[in-house]
């Protein structure tokens, strides 16, 4: 349960608000641009949520608002509301506040769980109790991050890889993900095309057909399955 500080919301300068917990949130440029328009038109409607960690205010909820405000010359301060919590509680609060607002994303949940287990040393059972979820749910979210290779994880963090695409990438062995990512960037593949490429890759485990898929992804998608997997060379 959130423990709100016994004080009224207050204004803070933007540079007083830290973003160390932003690593557990997806950066979605389109959403931030939409928030900029909203702030310009209506101003700040509700306070963002912060906690104090090591003597500094750290943002827990309101990352789009802070990111948008930093890009607007007209905004130099934001109203904040503080909760009293430690680092583990802050991570749980990020999950809880977003779930209450109907804004949870599977990948963001996975990042928080990964941090609680791998950084804070909690067991999966302890994380389940902290977040009010079943252990199997925690296990699935943890696997989602741990099956994602470092390059894909980094691109997801900065918004270059969508959560939908990430769910396809984790179907592949970590060692194969970088090659598929290169194809996605080079060919500007859609999510539907990426899904098809991952399906093909798993159906055709041989080196030659997989090289063909990497070199000619759209052509491979248009070929009959038997041709793609057995021949793996261009006609």
Regions found by a protein language model. Name each.
Residues 108-119, 139-235:
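Amphipathic alpha-helical extensions and coiled-coil-like segments
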Residues 24-26, 67-147:
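Amphipathic, charge-rich alpha-helical segments that serve as recognition/docking helices
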Residues 31, 35, 65, 91, ...:
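Helical mechanochemical/support elements of P-loop NTPase systems and associated helical scaffolds
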Residues 1-83, 94, 100:
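Short, charged/polar connector segments at secondary-structure boundaries
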Residues 47, 77-81, 125, 136, ...:
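A local structural micro-motif
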Residues 53, 133-134, 161:
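An acidic- and aromatic-residue-enriched active-site/binding cleft used to recognize and process polar
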């Amino acid at each position: 349960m959130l423990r709100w500080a016994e004080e009224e919301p207050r204004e803070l300068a933007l540079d007083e608000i830290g973003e160390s917990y932003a690593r557990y949130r997806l950066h979605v440029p389109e959403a931030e641009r939409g928030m900029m328009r909203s702030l310009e038109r209506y101003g700040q409607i509700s306070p963002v949520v912060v906690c104090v960690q090591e003597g500094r205010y750290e943002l827990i909820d309101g990352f789009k608002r802070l990111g948008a405000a930093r890009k607007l010359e007209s905004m130099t301060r934001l109203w904040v509301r503080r909760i009293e919590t430690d680092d583990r509680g802050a991570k749980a609060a990020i999950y809880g506040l977003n779930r209450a607002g109907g804004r949870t994303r599977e990948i963001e949940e996975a990042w928080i769980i990964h941090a609680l287990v791998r950084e804070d040393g909690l067991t999966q059972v302890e994380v389940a109790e902290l977040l009010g979820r079943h252990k199997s749910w925690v296990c699935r979210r943890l696997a989602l991050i741990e099956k994602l290779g470092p390059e894909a994880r980094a691109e997801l963090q900065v918004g270059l890889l969508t959560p939908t695409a990430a769910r396809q990438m984790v179907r592949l062995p970590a060692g194969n993900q970088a090659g598929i990512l290169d194809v996605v960037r080079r060919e500007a593949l859609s999510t539907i095309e990426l899904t098809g490429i991952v399906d093909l890759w798993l159906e055709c485990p041989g080196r030659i057909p997989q090289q063909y898929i990497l070199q000619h992804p759209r052509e491979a998608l248009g070929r009959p399955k038997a041709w793609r997997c057995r021949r793996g060379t261009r006609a």
